[in-house]
Amino acid sequence: GVVPHDFRI
């Protein structure tokens, strides 16, 4: 993701 807490691919 874009923000540090968004670890989606």
Swiss-Prot record:
Main localization (coarse): secreted
Q: In which tissues is it expressed?
A: Expressed by the venom gland.
Q: Where, per UniProt, does this protein localize? A: Secreted
Q: Which GO terms describe its cellular component?
A: extracellular region
Superkingdom classification of source: Eukaryota
Alphabetic keyword roster: Antimicrobial, Secreted
Per the entry, what this protein does is:
May have antimicrobial properties, like most ant linear peptides.
**Official protein name in the record:** U1-poneritoxin-Da1a
